[in-house]
C-alpha cells in the first residue's frame, strides 16, 4: 500500500496514522521516511493502545531533547491531508461510523489510504469449521465493491478499490492460532457464546493437522491460510451547497413569468 503513494501528486504536511498498534509499525516507519517533513498524528481510541503506542514511540532517555510523538483518541476535524489505516476496517464493529470519522478528520482534497481483509480470507478455516459443525471462526468480511459504496455514503469521492490474495504457510496449528489472535476478533453473531475448554482447543489443533484438513499445504508438514487483502483510497471533495427541499415563489412572480412572451433571436 505504501508504494501506491508514489501516484499521489501532493505530499501531506499533516497525516494521520489511525491505530498503528493494530496496523503495524513497519508501514508507519516507511511513511515517516517518505514524508520526513510532515507532521504525524497517531490516533488510538482505546487507552490501553495509547499506552502501548507511547511506549513504542518514546525516544531513548539519552535523547532527552526529543519530544514524545503525540497519540490522541480522536483526530481534530478537517486538518489532515492524508489518513492511513492498515488492516483495521474489517475488524471494526461499526465501520460506517469509522468511515465518517475518517472523513471528518481530513481536509478538503485530502485522501484516505486503507487496507482490510476481504471475503475470501480464511476460507480453509471456514471449511474446517463447517465440516465439524462448528459456528464460523470469523465474521463475514465485506466485499471491496461494497466498501466503495460505503465510502461514497460517508462523503468520499472517487473511490478506487483493488485486491490481492495471499497464501501464508505455518509450521503447525499453534502458529496458525497465534497469527489469528494478532489479526483481531471474531465478531460473528453466531460465534461460540462462551469460552471453549482446553480440550476443545486441543481437538481444534488436531483437526487442523488431520489428513483431510482443508488447511494442509502442498508443502509437507505445513498448514496454509488464504487472505484476501483489499486496498482502497478515496478523496474528500469540496462540500456541495445544500439545496432546499422546497422553493417558494410568490404568485405574482409566477404570473409574471408565465405572462412573458418568448423572445426570438
For each feature predicted by the language model, list its residue ranges:
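Class I SAM-dependent methyltransferase SAM/SAH-binding core
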Residues: 2-77, 82, 97
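C-terminal lobe and adjacent flexible extensions of AdoMet/dcAdoMet transferase-like proteins
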Residues: 6, 154, 174-265
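Short conserved AdoMet
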Residues: 10, 93, 107
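Domain-wide signal for the mature, well-folded portions of proteins, strongly enriched
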Residues: 13, 36, 123, 142, ...
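Catalytic cores of nucleotide-enabled group-transfer and carboxylate-activating enzymes in metabolic
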Residues: 73-76, 102, 135, 220
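Short catalytic micro-motifs in class I SAM-dependent methyltransferases
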Residues: 86-90
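A short glycine-rich, Lys/Arg-flanked "PGG" loop and its adjoining helix->strand segment in the class I
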Residues: 96-111
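Conserved catalytic/acceptor-binding region of the Class I
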Residues: 113-175, 183-196
Amino acid at each position: 500500500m505504501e508504494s501506491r503513494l508514489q501516484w499521489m501528486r501532493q505530499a501531506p504536511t499533516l497525516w494521520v496514522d489511525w491505530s498503528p498498534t493494530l496496523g503495524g509499525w513497519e508501514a508507519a516507519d516507511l511513511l515517516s521516511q517518505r514524508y520526513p517533513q510532515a507532521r504525524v498524528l497517531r490516533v488510538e481510541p482505546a487507552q490501553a493502545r495509547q499506552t502501548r503506542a507511547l511506549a513504542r514511540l518514546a525516544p531513548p532517555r539519552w535523547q532527552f531533547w526529543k519530544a514524545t510523538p503525540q497519540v490522541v483518541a480522536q483526530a481534530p476535524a478537517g486538518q489532515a491531508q492524508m489518513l492511513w489505516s492498515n488492516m483495521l476496517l474489517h475488524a471494526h464493529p461499526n465501520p460506517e461510523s469509522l468511515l465518517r470519522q475518517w472523513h471528518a478528520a481530513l481536509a478538503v482534497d485530502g485522501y484516505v489510504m486503507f487496507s482490510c481483509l476481504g471475503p475470501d480470507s480464511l476460507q480453509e478455516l471456514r471449511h474446517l469449521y463447517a465440516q465439524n459443525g462448528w459456528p464460523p471462526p470469523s465474521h463475514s468480511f465485506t466485499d471491496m465493491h461494497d466498501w466503495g459504496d460505503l465510502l461514497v455514503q460517508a462523503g468520499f469521492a472517487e473511490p478506487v478499490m483493488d485486491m490481492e490474495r495471499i497464501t501464508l504457510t505455518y509450521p503447525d496449528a499453534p502458529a496458525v492460532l497465534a497469527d489469528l489472535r494478532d489479526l483481531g476478533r471474531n465478531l460473528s453473531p453466531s460465534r461460540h457464546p462462551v469460552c471453549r475448554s482446553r480440550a476443545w482447543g486441543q481437538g481444534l489443533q488436531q483437526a487442523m493437522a488431520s489428513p483431510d484438513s482443508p488447511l494442509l499445504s502442498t508443502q509437507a508438514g505445513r498448514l496454509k491460510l488464504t487472505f484476501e487483502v483489499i486496498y482502497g483510497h478515496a478523496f474528500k471533495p469540496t462540500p456541495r451547497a445544500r439545496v432546499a427541499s422546497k422553493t417558494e415563489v410568490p404568485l405574482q412572480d409566477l404570473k409574471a413569468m408565465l405572462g412573458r412572451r418568448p423572445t426570438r433571436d
